[in-house]
């Protein structure tokens, strides 16, 4: 699985810690991590939580990522922004049990974490435990066991509902403010990470032409 890490500007200084912790957990499982930044608070490409949502939508809908890890100060804004896009099911995780239950019950493809709120001593330990519970036990298996059937049924229903209530990502890219879009994909390593991994020719061609 290809996991993309996105950090918005208010918590950009924590990107190295988050990346290191994520890689420590998921690379031994056979997963790949692509770090889309921000890398420091002074990056030329300033990603807000709204841009983090747009970038998550681009990565997941193009197939350039299978999963997105993002967040903001509280995680709430990033979650809302991510869920405004098609093909993105983003959960808000604050502890390891959230990670396990989101993976098993909701079976989403994106998570938003609080990187300021309650992020003090031992923060990297909590992150490590969250990532282990999120990625270490498969997805969509249900929890508790007696709730597996209705949970899996509801997940399929939610996917069908989102397909109806959201527009195609390529249409959004055409209609969204183009300056905002260009800023979102102007990260230092966006091109080298995104275009080789992109599986949607229309999305890739449109972004490359900007």
Language model regions located:
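A short beta-strand-loop structural module common to alpha/beta enzyme folds
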Residues: 29-46
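Short, ordered loop/turn segments at secondary-structure junctions
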Residues: 38-39, 73-74, 97, 115-118
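Short Gly/Thr/Asp-enriched flexible loops that form oxyanion-binding sites at enzyme active sites
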Residues: 77-90, 94-95
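C-terminal binding/interaction regions
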Residues: 4-17, 100-210
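Short, structured active-site "lid" loops
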Residues: 48-67
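Short glycine/serine/threonine-rich phosphate/pyrophosphate-binding segments
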Residues: 15-16, 53, 75-81
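A short, small-residue-rich loop immediately preceding and capping a beta-strand
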Residues: 65-71, 90
């Amino acid at each position: 699985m290809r996991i993309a890490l996105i950090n918005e500007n208010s918590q950009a200084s924590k990107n190295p810690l988050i990346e290191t912790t994520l890689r420590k957990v998921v690379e031994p499982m056979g997963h790949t991590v692509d770090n889309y930044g921000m890398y420091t608070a002074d990056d030329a490409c300033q990603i807000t939580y709204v841009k983090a949502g747009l970038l998550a939508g681009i990565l997941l809908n193009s197939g350039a990522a299978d999963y997105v890890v993002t967040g903001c100060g509280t995680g709430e804004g990033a979650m809302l922004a991510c869920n405004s896009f098609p093909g993105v099911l983003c959960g808000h995780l604050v502890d390891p049990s959230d990670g396990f239950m989101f993976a098993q019950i909701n079976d989403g493809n994106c998570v938003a974490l609080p990187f300021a709120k309650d992020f003090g001593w031992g923060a990297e330990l909590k992150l490590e435990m969250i990532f282990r519970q999120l990625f270490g036990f498969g997805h969509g298996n249900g929890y508790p066991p007696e709730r597996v059937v209705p949970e899996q049924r509801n997940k399929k229903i939610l996917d069908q509902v989102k397909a109806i209530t959201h527009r195609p990502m390529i249409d959004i890219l055409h209609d969204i403010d183009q300056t905002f879009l260009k800023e979102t994909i102007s990260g230092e390593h966006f091109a080298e990470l995104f275009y080789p991994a992109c599986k949607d020719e229309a999305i890739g061609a449109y972004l490359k032409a900007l």
